[in-house]
């Protein structure tokens, strides 16, 4: 989708710069909406929106530091960053409505799946997908307030989620399990780590 958007924009609109694309009047140049739709599609697949979230959940076999990078600050953030950049163009468009609906559904569905998960890393993965859905929904609205809300969610999610993944990895190294059912009494066994986890949880919400 991203490659198609670039090629179409270059060949039909003679624009290869995203900043220039954002200044084009979509009403005067119909082809802009095609580029916008393809960019939004590419961004949503990159940011693990339903139904393209399977790869992110499958990455749980990776070591914990790798999971922290994948889920908090690098790969998935590229997609939502692109959506935030093109968010003003999506305001009041069909593309924006679809992006908002898909983001909202992903947020709700991933939250429900997280409730039924006992694996600590997989639970955090569902939480990541859910948070990304909320950011995508904010980007689809296209209002300045929603864009700023999305930006703040990106920052808090990047910091807090990486902290949470590293904490779960530390618990797994000490206890030999990342099942949340085995984490009862953690405040007594590992008080400092438990406090850090609480800070990460508070940062998420």
Where are these regions (language model features)?
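...captures the hydrophobic TM-helix bundle architecture rather than a specific catalytic motif
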Residues: 1-205
């Amino acid at each position: 989708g991203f490659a198609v958007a670039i090629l179409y924009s270059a060949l039909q609109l003679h624009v290869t710069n995203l900043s220039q694309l954002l200044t084009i009047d979509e009403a005067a140049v119909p082809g802009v909406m095609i580029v916008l739709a393809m960019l939004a599609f590419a961004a949503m697949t990159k940011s693990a929106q339903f139904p393209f979230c399977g790869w992110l959940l499958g990455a749980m076999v990776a070591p914990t530091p790798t999971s922290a990078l994948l889920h908090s600050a690098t790969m998935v953030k590229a997609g939502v960053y692109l959506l935030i950049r093109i968010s003003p163009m999506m305001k009041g468009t069909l593309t924006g409505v679809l992006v908002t609906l898909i983001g909202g559904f992903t947020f709700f569905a991933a939250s429900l799946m997280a409730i039924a998960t006992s694996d600590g890393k997989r639970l955090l993965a569902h939480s990541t997908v859910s948070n990304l859905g909320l950011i995508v929904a904010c980007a689809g609205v296209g209002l300045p307030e929603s864009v700023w809300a999305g930006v703040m969610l990106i920052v808090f999610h990047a910091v807090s989620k990486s902290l949470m993944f590293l904490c779960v990895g530390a618990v797994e190294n000490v206890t030999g399990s990342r099942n949340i059912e085995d984490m009862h009494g953690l405040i007594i066994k590992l008080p400092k780590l438990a406090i850090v986890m609480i800070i990460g949880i508070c940062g998420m919400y």
